[in-house]
């Protein structure tokens, strides 16, 4: 009887997690966590841009981080002569890796958020607003929310684990299950957005890059 009950609970949970309406409502229910992660991203972006512009050390550190980022992009083996499908698949692989890593890291995904803010602030400083608008914004307006959602999902998952392991106040099984379900809904939504962002980056942004660098 207990096994049958657990199976029924699991099936109900899976049905809820993959319900599109529930997935779309999840950001509203978890807006406080999402706003917190968004605030970390925005403040990091603004603060790091100010530091990069005004302090040479941060500009130098930005050089190192950006060079490592470029090496990572080169490892994807994307060139201006590649077909769109190859580019999109390579971007998807990279984006989904970041998405899952963000989720697994939980609260430590805020460090990933800060590093991405550093890269964006450095690109804006190094290449100017025009290049930033043309080469980052087309896919960035989708990719950045996806990054924030995956990090928010990771934070929620951590909250569920803390409740489970330490059994702090309100640490009931129902509370733990709620956190895990909500975190997975945000993860699924972030994956969807990362897929869309990859298509935009592999088509629109890529075409803009070809025009600018040809």
Curated annotation (Swiss-Prot):
It is found in: Cell membrane. One of its GO terms (cellular component) is plasma membrane. The keyword rRNA-binding does not apply. Keywords: Cell membrane, Membrane, Transmembrane, Transmembrane helix. InterPro entries: SpoIIM-like (IPR002798). The chain crosses the membrane at residues 33-53, 104-124, 132-152, 153-173, 186-206. It is a multi-pass membrane protein. Its main location: membrane. Pfam families: SpoIIM. This is Uncharacterized protein MJ0706.
């Amino acid at each position: 009887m207990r096994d049958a009950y657990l199976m029924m609970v699991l099936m109900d949970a899976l049905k809820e997690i993959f319900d599109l309406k529930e997935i779309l409502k999840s950001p509203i229910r978890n807006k406080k966590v999402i706003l917190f992660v968004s605030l970390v991203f925005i403040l990091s972006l603004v603060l790091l841009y100010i530091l990069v512009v005004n302090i040479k050390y941060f500009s130098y550190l930005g050089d190192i981080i950006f060079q490592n980022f470029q090496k990572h992009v080169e490892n994807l083996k994307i060139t201006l002569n590649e077909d769109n499908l190859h580019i999109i698949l390579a971007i998807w692989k990279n984006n989904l890796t970041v998405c899952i890593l963000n989720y697994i890291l939980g609260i430590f995904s805020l460090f990933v958020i800060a590093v991405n803010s550093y890269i964006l602030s450095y690109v804006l400083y190094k290449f100017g607003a025009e290049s930033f608008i043309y080469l980052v914004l087309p896919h960035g307006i989708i990719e950045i929310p996806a990054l924030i959602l995956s990090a928010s999902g990771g934070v929620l998952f951590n909250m569920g684990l803390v409740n489970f392991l330490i059994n702090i106040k309100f640490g009931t099984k129902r509370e733990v299950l709620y956190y895990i379900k909500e975190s997975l809904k945000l993860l699924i939504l972030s994956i969807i957005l990362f897929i869309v962002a990859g298509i935009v980056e592999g088509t629109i942004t890529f075409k803009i890059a070809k025009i600018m660098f040809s």
